[in-house]
Design a protein with these regions (language model features):
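C-terminal helical "lid" of AAA+/P-loop NTPase domains
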Residues: 182-187, 193-207, 213-217, 237-241
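C-terminal engagement/docking regions of AAA+ P-loop ATPases
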Residues: 213-250
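Walker A/P-loop
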Residues: 1, 27-69, 83-84, 113-118
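Short glycine-rich substrate-engagement loop in P-loop NTPases that contacts/grips substrate
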Residues: 21-26, 63-95, 106
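Conserved AAA+ ATPase "sensor/coupling" helix adjacent to the nucleotide-binding pocket
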Residues: 142, 158-171, 201-202
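Conserved AAA+ ATPase "SRH/arginine-finger" region at the nucleotide-binding site
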Residues: 69-71, 144-157
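A short helix-turn-beta junction within AAA+ P-loop NTPase domains corresponding to the substrate/partner-engaging
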Residues: 63, 136-151
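Conserved catalytic/switch belt of AAA+ P-loop NTPases
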Residues: 32, 102-141
Length: 251
């Protein structure tokens, strides 16, 4: 099992960053702690806590829980989860988490509407895309949307420390070069999963001392560019405006 899954937070307070979502008096935190959780859409870059938050919410409820990945799951799996909401075992309701929901087509999204409307199913879905571009209006109108922001290096360091303690406890104590954790956190593009993967690889690729140069060789700094996402169109817009403004350096 990857280190990122082993040291995954088990409470909302352990989630890295996202204070706007999980601080004590935030709207989302209050919804989670209430008994009236609506269907939710989590959107944001990879490795920012969307799946972790869904898992924590699932453990807090007494609902029947299904987890589906839209990139690999079939229509039959979705149908089975929806059908289960009609059984006695789903007396307290059904919670379904759909990861990468942007890969569900309109027909699949529409199949969920009936169950969302009558309350048999509470849905948590996540996407790395802008939900207002990839999800259908009728589906979005029945959900509350929350954005997960890229993590800062400072917010990622505690997760790296937690991962390092686990590795040392499980496989043996090792030393680290000063500034190693900060170096890893600065080159992972706000993705805590990537940071923990780099840490894990660095640990096993090193002798008794983990060094920054080894971590750097095992990490490639993310530029955050996505040919299909918002960043692609933001970049094109910036290029167009630079050309329009006769700024060759800017272009």
């Amino acid at each position: 099992m990857p280190l990122a899954d082993i040291v995954r937070p088990s409470t909302l307070d352990e989630i890295c960053g996202q204070g706007h979502l999980f601080s004590k008096n935030s709207p989302l935190r209050r919804l989670i702690e209430s008994e009236h959780l609506p269907s939710l859409v989590f959107f944001g870059p990879p490795g920012t806590g969307k799946t972790t938050a869904a898992d924590i919410i699932a453990k807090r409820t007494n609902k029947q829980f299904f987890k589906i990945n839209a990139t690999t799951s079939s229509v039959a799996e979705l149908r089975d989860a929806l059908t289960a909401s009609n059984t006695l075992s789903a007396f307290n309701g059904t919670l379904i988490y759909i990861d990468e929901i942007q890969y569900f087509n309109k027909k699949q999204q529409q199949a969920l509407l009936e169950y969302l409307e009558d309350g048999r199913v509470t849905l948590i879905s996540s996407t790395t895309e802008n939900p207002y571009f990839v999800l259908y209006p009728a589906f979005l109108s029945r959900c509350a949307c929350f954005e997960f922001k890229p993590l800062t290096p400072k917010e990622i360091v505690p997760a790296i420390q937690r991962g390092f303690l686990y590795l040392c406890k499980t496989y043996g104590e090792k030393e680290t070069e000063e500034g190693l954790f900060e170096s890893i956190s600065a080159t992972c593009g706000g993705d805590v999963r990537k940071a923990l993967t780099v840490l894990e690889n660095t640990y096993f690729a090193s002798g008794q001392r983990l060094e920054i140069k080894v971590a750097s060789q095992l990490s490639q700094k993310s530029t955050g560019y996505d040919s299909d996402g918002d960043g692609h169109y933001d970049l094109l817009s910036a290029l167009q405006k630079s050309i329009r403004g006769s700024d060759p350096d800017g272009a």
